[in-house]
Structures are given as structure tokens and as C-alpha cells.
Amino acid sequence: MKWVTFLLLLFVSDSAFSRGLFRRDAHKSEIAHRFKDLGEQHFKGLVLIAFSQFLQKCPYEEHVKLVNEVTDFAKTCVADESAENCDKSLHTLFGDKLCAIPTLRDSYGELADCCAKKEPERNECFLKHKDDHPNLPPFVRPDAEAMCTSFQENAVTFMGHYLHEVARRHPYFYAPELLYYAEKYSAIMTECCGEADKAACITPKLDALKEKALASSVNQRLKCSSLQRFGQRAFKAWAVARMSQKFPKADFAEITKLATDLTKLTEECCHGDLLECADDRAELAKYMCENQASISSKLQACCDKPVLKKSHCLSEVENDDLPADLPSLAADFVEDKEVCKNYAEAKDVFLGTFLYEYARRHPDYSVALLLRLAKKYEATLEKCCAEADPSACYGKVLDEFQPLVEEPKNLVKANCELFEKLGEYGFQNALIVRYTQKAPQVSTPTLVEAARNLGKVGSKCCVLPEAQRLPCVEDYISAILNRVCVLHEKTPVSEQVTKCCTGSVVERRPCFSALPVDETYVPKEFKAETFTFHADICSLPEKEKQMKKQAALVELVKHKPKATGPQLRTVLGEFTAFLDKCCKAEDKEACFSEDGPKLVASSQAALA
């Protein structure tokens, strides 16, 4: 590749922020501009999400009042952009609304201290008070008849409650995507409420929607964590790798533009700038659909859809076909005599080009693996370009990638084989033992949640064709481990977890995989009450029964971290038989009272 091309790409990279999407300086009133672009329905939905994500304890009715006030003000500004306060930034307008709430300090304590700050510090302060694990009651879905009655009486209020409940429990949920899920939810209700058996129609559809929405939430949280901890450069590298895999026929200039725009709008949503984010996401979708010829042959079906469905479809579009006869990577990145000169003159562009070329050739790799390879290449050039004979030093760099590639491949193979042998529930239990031994100080509910989510990787990824397994497994696990890290950062208890969570995001999964049993942990004292159960467990749904048993398994491992597999299987087998027997007994509680102490005694003996 000639160096003039690099200079062109450098120009493209530096100028991308000023192209296309980002033209907000031209508008006298930002809020009027966003209202006109988004339309009233989406505007109100986004404002509701924003307030729900910042003020997670407030009831729905209070948020609706704020939303209506902001919407009325926006309409005033649409009518006259020079009206009072219409020229204020959205941060200022939203921050002033939050700070005007009379009960702010009573309800949110230290959050009220943010109001003494000026923008942008005030908004940053609000962001720091978002709670990833708010103290809210579990959301219980009403029965189908009650839901249909509420939906048919007032669909707008019904869907408003949905946005509010999801947003306050997931304060980093990707706002325009949440609007998409609300649309899907509404369509399910419209379809199913006309059916004779409403529950049979609603339950499986909403369960599937919930699963997808939760996956979307953890993926977005990983993106926000990456931006918060490592900044735009790290996220843009992720975006370049992913876009290059999806759109291998697009040139580097096009990929750079898409990655830059995606980085900007993702940062907006992560910073709570939801109106800008949603508007810019729609603009990016428009740009992609207007430039399909230079991006991908797979976009047309998405581009025929309305805005929310279009953006969602584009984010999940299948990878385009690889270009024919791609040249060897070695020519530009190993054999070229000016590798060190090209690297020194524009490091980020040179590395970005390497990442682009490698990623477009490897849709079968995870983004995290591609970034580890780019990091290895960068470290090799840093070392070798300072030596007397650089080319002799970096000549084998592509061969040195092999161990980095083999490690996740072996992980996927071993875990998918284990999943196929044990099934999802058994695989989750194996992960519970593994992760409790690595981090026994972590709370039992967090370990159960993490292991159950990690265990879903089997049914999600191991069923895919071989070429799709690695990216599915590692990128999914990265998102789940980020959830563990976010919760652990709030209340750190394990030095091993802290070590993995504070390092590089792309090294996090290998770090967790390599963690040994924590030898510093002092085993928990055995308490009979931890393993005492009553007849009420028999009436629980199967999922909740599983979680009770898995919590007991965590506690067993915390009591005996070095328990062997056969020991744990013996105890779990006895426990399952005990539950089966007592739940079938005529006098269930008497059975639990009589056989429970025997189970506790035999468990202690088995683990002795």
C-alpha cells in the first residue's frame, strides 16, 4: 500500500467528525431541532427514558409530568426558536429540570450535590450516580387478561410504564433500541389481546422479547464501560473491527467514517444525550442506505423498513460476502521495507488499516481476539522498530499470533463439549463451581446470576456452525463479565476480580479464564440454616427452583472451595432426591422438617 494512501486515510480519519451527522451548530435551538427531527412520539419516549435512567426511584406519574413540561417547552421553541431559554443546551435544560425537583435531596441524597456544579461537570456528576443495581422490587408481569385490559384502555400509558420500568432498571439501555423493543411489545399486545387464549399467545412472545432486550442491555453496558474507562480510541478500534467484519467490501475510508459516527452516537447515549443519540442514529441509518453500493450488498431489506426497525436491522445485518482474491496481509504489514516508517508517521491510521484488513478476512474471529492481535502487532512494532534490523525482528509476527488464536478456540471447543454433555442447567452448575472457586468473596446472588447468564452461551452459540461459534461465545462472555465487573466495582470484595476488571477490556475474558482457585479465601463456616428448605419451594416455578438449588451450590463451594467434582455431585444428587421426595409427599412440611436435618448431616459428611 502506497504511503500517499495512508495520508489520504489520515485526512479522512481526522475529518470524519465534521462530516455527515454532526451539524448541530447550525441550529439556533437544539431542543426545537431535535423535536422536529424525531417527531413528538419518539421525542416524548426518549425524554421519559432519560428521566427514568437518571431518577430511578421516581414513580411513573412524576416522570410523565416532567416529560409533558419538556415537550410543551420544545413546542414553544419550535414555534419561535428565539423564545426565552430555547437557545440553552439540552444538558442545561434537562439538568435544570432535575434540580428543580423539590424532593431531590430527600429521595436521592448526594445526587442533589450535583446541582451546585455547572455544565458539563453537572451532567458528569449525574452520570456517576446512575445505579446499575437499583434497590427496586423485582418486576412481576401481570396476568395476560389484566395486561390486555390495561393495554386496550390506554395503550400510550401502558407502553409508557414499560419504558419507565425497563429504563430505571437498566440506566444505560440504548435508548433508540428501547423504543424499538417498545414497538415490538405493543405489536405483541395488539396481536395477542384478540386471541381466545391470551396467555398462550403473550407469554412465549414476551419471554423471547425480554431475552433479546436483556442481551441488548448488557451489550450496550459493555460499550459504555469501554468508553468510560478507555475513551473514544478504544471504542473506535472495536467499531472498526466489527464494521470490517460486517462490510468487508467497503474500503477503509468508508469503514472509518462509519466507525467514527457510531463512536460519536454511542458516546451520546452513554452520556445520557438521548435525543442527539437517537437523531444521529437515524442519520447514520439514512447515510448507510443512501450509500449501499460502497458499504454492503446486504442492506436493502433493512433500508425498506421504518426508522426504528431500519436501525435495528442494520445493527444485526449479516456479514457481506468476502471480496475475491484478497492479497496476503504480509505484503503490507511484514514484507514492505517501510513498515516502521509508515507506522511512525501515522500510528493510529497504520494500526487501523491493519485491524481493518485482518478483520475483514476473519469474520470467524471475535472482535476481542482481533483487538488482541492488533495489540500484539503494535507491541511488536514498538519493540522491533527501535532495533538495528527491524524486519528480522518483526518478520515472524503473523506466526506469533497462533497461540493467541488457539487459546479462545480451545476454550470454545471445551465449553461447547461440556454444554453438549451436561445440558444448560448442568453447564450452569459447572460454571457456578468454577467461578465460585475463582471469586468466593463475591455475593451468592451475583455468582448465580453470572453463572446462569454465562451458561446460556451454550444454547446461544454452541448450536451455531463452527465458523460462527468463536465470535458468538467470546463477545457474549465479554458482555456478561462486564456486568460482573460493573457490580464488583461498586462493592469490591475480590482482588482477583479487581485485577481482571481493571485491566484491558479485550484481555478481561482471558484473565478470568486463567484465574486459579483463590488460595487466600478463608472458607465459610457451615451453617445448617443455609441448607434448610420448606414446602414453599415446591410451588415455585422451575426457574426459581433451579436458582434456589444453585444458590445452595454456591454456598457449598464457599464452605468447601476444594471440594471435588464427585463430592459435589453426590451432595447435589441427594439434594435433588430430597426435593423430589418431599414435594411429592402428602405432608410436605413434615417431610422437609424430618428429612432436612438428615440431608444437612449427610452433606457435611460427604464434604468432610
Curated annotation (Swiss-Prot):
Cu cation binds at residue 27. SMART domains: ALBUMIN. CDD domains: ALBUMIN. The modification N6-methyllysine is found at residue 558. PROSITE patterns: ALBUMIN_1 (PS00212), ALBUMIN_2 (PS51438). Disulfide bonds join 77-86, 99-115, 114-125, 148-193, 192-201, 224-270, 269-277, 289-303, 302-313, 340-385, 384-393, 416-462, 461-472, 485-501, 500-511, 538-583, 582-591. Residues 19-211, 212-403, 404-601 form the Albumin domain. Ca(2+) 1 binds at residues 30, 268, 273, 276. The modification Phosphoserine is found at residues 29, 82, 89, 297, 443, 513. Plasma. GO terms for molecular function: enterobactin binding; lipid binding; metal ion binding. It is found in: Secreted. It comes from the Eukaryota. One of its GO terms (cellular component) is cytoplasm. The modification Phosphothreonine is found at residues 444, 446, 570. Ca(2+) 2 binds at residues 37, 279. The modification N6-succinyllysine is found at residues 460, 543, 588. Zn(2+) binds at residues 91, 271, 273. Binds water, Ca(2+), Na(+), K(+), fatty acids, hormones, bilirubin and drugs. Its main function is the regulation of the colloidal osmotic pressure of blood. Major zinc transporter in plasma, typically binds about 80% of all plasma zinc. Major calcium and magnesium transporter in plasma, binds approximately 45% of circulating calcium and magnesium in plasma. Potentially has more than two calcium-binding sites and might additionally bind calcium in a non-specific manner. PANTHER family: ALBUMIN, SERUM ALBUMIN-RELATED. Interacts with FCGRT; this interaction regulates ALB homeostasis. Interacts with TASOR. In plasma, occurs in a covalently-linked complex with chromophore-bound alpha-1-microglobulin; this interaction does not prevent fatty acid binding to ALB. Belongs to the ALB/AFP/VDB family. This is Albumin.
